[in-house]
Amino acid sequence: MRSTSYFFVFLALAAVFISPPISFSDDLNNEVYLLSKNNKLLAFSGLQNKWSEKDLGTGETVVKSDYDGNVAVAYTQDRALAFSGITGRWSEERFRIHETVESIKAQGNVGTIITNIRALAFSAKKGIWVESVFDIHD
């Protein structure tokens, strides 16, 4: 009986060392691709297995874009745009007067656009923008 117990302990320890590592958001597969072409933004969702397009206005051009994981973000002179590979939908947030973009980033399920007056965050899971306005009186 005693040797059987040792055998099961050995099997349990071997399973711990052989099992695959836990995957964190940094290891998230890229499921989205973003392309700017012919006055449109085109996003491909690997999860939905389809392309989705967003028309740009007359004279509107993409200044900068980024994509990673399940999210793609871009901005033009007029608005912030984001695509969720999970929902397969676009969302937009118009810029305010005298608002200038300082940074743009896509990582995992989150896209961010930081401006001189607020931080915009887009969740690929929810498919919506959330803002935090900076207190300019500090």
What role is predicted for each listed range?
Residues 49-56, 89-94, 128-133:
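A short beta-strand motif characteristic of beta-propeller blades
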Residues 22-31, 57-70, 96-109, 136-138:
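Repeated scaffold domains used in trafficking and secretory/extracellular systems
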Residues 38-44, 78-84, 118-123:
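Structural motif
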Residues 8-17:
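Bacterial N-terminal signal peptides
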Residues 44-79:
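N-terminal, post-signal-peptide region of Sec/Tat-exported proteins
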Residues 31-36, 71-75, 109-115, 121:
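Short beta-strand motif characteristic of blades in beta-propeller domains
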Residues 24-51:
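An edge-strand/N-cap motif at the start of beta-rich repeat modules
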